[in-house]
Amino acid sequence: MLEKFNSFMEKWMAFVTPACLLTGVLFPDIAKHGVPYVTYAFAFMTFIGALKSRFRDVADVFKRPLPLILMLLILLVLGPVAACGLGHLLFPGNMNYITGMVLEFSVPAAVISLMWVSIYNGNSPLSLSLVVIDTILAPFLIPAVLKLLVGSSVKMDTVGMMKELVFMIALPAVLAMCLNEVSHGKVMETWPKKLAPFSKMCLIFVVTSNSSKVSPYMKHLNGERLEVAAAILVLAAGGYAIGWIIAILTRQNKAATVSMIYGSGMRNISAGAVIAGAYFPAETLFPVMIGTLFQQILAAFYGSMMRRVQTGQQEREKEHGVSA
């Protein structure tokens, strides 16, 4: 039963995620009750995602660091600069929107990307390393980026972010890798498949709960806000695409390509929302929160695209094999 559910979810993820988003937006009073438990769901997804990793696998990432470095450059440099440029081009008189756009693409890589990487058989140690490093750097780099690009001064709760990092990423990841070491790889071979359905359930829960936060903004949409939403959609879609293109140009293998697509495209929007709500006017929060609507849909879309490309490549390889 659980295996059938897992197969169904993986096949129809491009439709399941929009349905979850719609549910959260339409029924926010119900969906919002899940928000306090989202952190625990993230921790569980990190644990499941890390079950495919060993300590030596993470060490190997740093022996061949090019994919990791490229993703960090996309996340830390290209994303914020592109957001700032497009913001000034489209909304030259509205610094709140520009600040929100820059903030949206300055926050670290998303923990939930580990689940998507796991679904499409990406390089889990590479993705785990990216999430950990980017989240550690975030309390120092986000204020610097905002100061440099939009002139805003922000003091972040570094200790609070570090505690969240430890609970959501470090502890579950270390626990999973320790289980792999103690079991001599047996856990790695059996647990990910058994726990995969529960990871999908967590995704449904997280997407539905978090999308409840967007509901107030969706009820008061106007022409300018639709333009902001379109700009965020273009930038978000571009992040995935750039990761894919750079992976092809640098001739990365299939697993690293999957990790680069999701590592370059998915952001920890919750962190951005906390910063925007604490330090900026309410208008700044809109570009950050509207990204919630697109992130999971784009993740499912690019996953579907990857499957089609890989299926096409396999069919061509078979044809060449037969003709040879």
Regions found by a protein language model. Name each.
Residues M1-A324:
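Alpha-helical transmembrane segments of multi-pass small-molecule/ion transporters
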